Amino acid sequence: RLSREAATWMSALPTQIRFQMGGKSLAVVHGAPSSVNQFIFPSTPVEPKLSEISATGCDGIICGHSGLPFTQIIDGLLWHNAGAIGLPANDGTRRTWFSVITPDEQGLRFEHLPLEYDAEGASDEMLAVGLPNEYANALTSGWWDNCDILPDEETKQQGIPLSFESTYWSSLRHTAE
């Protein structure tokens, strides 16, 4: 639960942050540049992703909201979802996800990394403050109670543990390593 002061502080935050790194311009948003609550998934068609990137005037987007980490390079442009630090990725594990971006002279390396934490303790704390059982259970089971927001492709992947290779994004090339 947020205090009124914390909620006021959060409401004043920008909906988009832009920065340069590794020779690339990036926009950081919650869901998508056009809507903070828009869900973008790996299976979301290319056209909406390219349209959202184009609208920013940047080379790529870093986002969250969908809870599923992924990185895609489309026509030389980037869509990177860092995952969710506060909820497992519906992969049947308790792990949450974060990303590390490492710049060098020729581009950026993106790594999705799992975070192990005290899932039982976090679940107990959620229940103690009256948060929904479904969220508390997701922490300990690694399964989402409801997949209504997920496209069919992501729904079919429920319970399959995620693993990632790093992705290198350069103006010259990109590779998954």
Which residues make up each language-model segment?
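Active-site environment of divalent metal-dependent phosphoester hydrolases
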Residues: 34-36, 61-73, 87-90
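Short, acidic/polar N-cap/turn motifs at the starts of alpha helices
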Residues: 14-18, 68-69, 98
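Positions that flank functional sites
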Residues: 25, 68, 141
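Active-site neighborhood of phospho(di)ester-bond hydrolases with catalytic His/Asp-centered motifs
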Residues: 29, 60-67, 79-83
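Acidic, His/Gly-rich catalytic cores of divalent-metal-dependent hydrolytic chemistry
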Residues: 73-177
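Short solvent-exposed loop/turn micro-motifs enriched in small/polar/acidic residues
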Residues: 10-12, 64-65, 92-94
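Conserved catalytic scaffold of divalent metal-dependent phosphoesterases
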Residues: 1-60
